[in-house]
Structure formats: structure tokens, C-alpha cells
């Protein structure tokens, strides 16, 4: 397994004075104090012990409220699993769904972890090159051409890292139409849902 090229650039940039690193996807501002204060309060209250495997129930309930408010999606806390980060969630999802020989469709450019995790499960990464003239959106005809009888999973990484591309409602409906009647699962990586620019707005 090759080391991450992005992490290599991150390490190099850290050693160069006055270098602005674009190597990892994180904001250029510090964590807001409302979040820091909540973390400090949690530590002061001794909330440092093991939780339920799925995560703290109150947190899962709050995630459900966020999804309803922001994405108009309705879930119950029993349907939510809290992980230590986005990469772990991606890893667990791919490991749960993909068996040796299964194909995983990955639009590119993309986050670096999709391919190695797929390979570790014995799955086969199938790359689709999105184009600048399409604003790096996955087109339905590209997806249709990539599907085979071995296709198990489509990764939808939008808003996209690193391009910032966003799929609109018509794009998503066209993708859904291609997948209707199949057993293909979708991993929707929406970690950058709140980081869109201009008039673009993320639709889950």
C-alpha cells in the first residue's frame, strides 16, 4: 500500500516557511469557541468513559435533528452510527459492503482513501474521470457505461474534494434513475456539505 501523496505534501509544506498548504481539506480558521467550550465542559464533567458502540444517544438524536433541518432527511437515533472521523466511516462502510471481486465506482478527482480501502477489501476500484466542463459532476451516461454485473458500490463524493464540485437535484435524479432496479449501493460522502461557494448549495 503506497503512502498518501497528499500527506507527503502536507509534511513538506509544514517544513517550508510562509508556505500556504492546500494539502488537506480543512478551514483556515480555528475551531470556534462554542465548540471548544463544549469540549472543555465535557472534560470537566468527566465524560471521558466508554459510550455505547453506536455513540452517545443524545449526540445521535442531535445528528437526526441536523439532518432533518439541513437535509430534509428523517432518521431515528437507532439508524445513526457515530465514528471517530469521516475516514473511519468510509472504511467501515466499504468493509461492510464490498467482497473480493466486487467493483466500486469512484468519480475522480477524489479523496485519496477510497481506492486503498477498496483494494484492502479485495474490491476492484473503477474510476470515472469527471471533467472541468461538467463542473466535475458525475454524468449519468458515464455511470451507466461503468456499471457491470460485478458493480457493488457507487461512491458519490459531493461536495467534491478537491474540486469543490456540487451535484444539483437534476444531476442526482439522473444518477438515481440509472441505479433504479439494481442492487448497487451508494456511499454518499458529504463531509463538505457546509463548505460550498457562490450560489451552489449541497443537496443530499
Language model: regions and residue ranges:
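A short helix-loop-beta submotif of the ANL/AMP-binding
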Residues: 120-126
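Active-site phosphate-binding strand-loop segment of PLP-dependent enzymes
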Residues: 126, 130-201
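Short acidic capping loops at alpha-helix termini that bridge into adjacent secondary structure
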Residues: 74-80, 100-103, 150
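Conserved PLP-anchoring active-site segment centered on the Schiff-base-forming lysine
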Residues: 96-118
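Helix C-cap/helix->beta junction micro-motif
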Residues: 16, 121, 181-182
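N-terminal small-domain helix-loop-helix segment of the aminotransferase-like
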Residues: 1-85, 92
Amino acid at each position: 500500500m503506497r503512502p498518501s501523496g497528499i500527506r507527503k505534501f502536507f509534511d513538506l509544506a509544514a517544513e517550508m516557511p510562509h508556505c500556504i498548504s492546500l494539502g488537506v481539506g480543512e478551514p483556515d480558521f480555528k475551531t470556534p469557541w462554542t465548540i471548544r467550550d463544549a469540549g472543555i465542559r465535557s472534560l470537566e464533567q468527566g465524560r471521558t468513559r466508554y459510550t455505547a458502540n453506536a455513540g452517545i444517544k443524545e449526540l445521535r438524536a442531535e445528528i437526526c435533528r441536523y439532518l432533518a433541518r439541513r437535509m430534509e432527511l428523517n432518521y431515528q437515533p437507532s439508524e445513526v452510527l457515530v465514528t471517530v472521523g469521516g475516514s473511519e466511516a468510509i472504511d467501515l462502510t466499504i468493509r461492510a459492503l464490498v467482497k473480493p471481486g466486487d467493483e466500486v465506482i469512484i468519480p475522480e478527482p477524489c479523496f485519496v482513501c477510497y481506492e486503498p480501502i477498496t483494494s484492502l477489501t479485495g474490491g476492484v476500484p473503477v474510476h470515472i474521470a469527471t471533467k472541468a466542463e461538467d463542473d466535475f459532476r458525475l454524468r449519468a451516461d458515464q455511470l451507466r457505461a461503468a456499471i457491470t454485473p460485478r458493480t457493488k458500490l457507487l461512491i458519490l463524493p459531493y461536495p467534491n474534494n478537491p474540486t469543490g464540485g456540487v451535484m444539483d437535484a437534476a444531476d442526482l435524479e439522473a444518477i438515481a434513475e440509472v441505479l433504479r432496479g439494481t442492487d448497487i449501493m451508494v456511499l454518499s460522502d458529504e463531509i463538505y456539505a457546509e463548505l460550498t461557494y457562490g450560489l451552489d448549495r449541497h443537496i443530499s
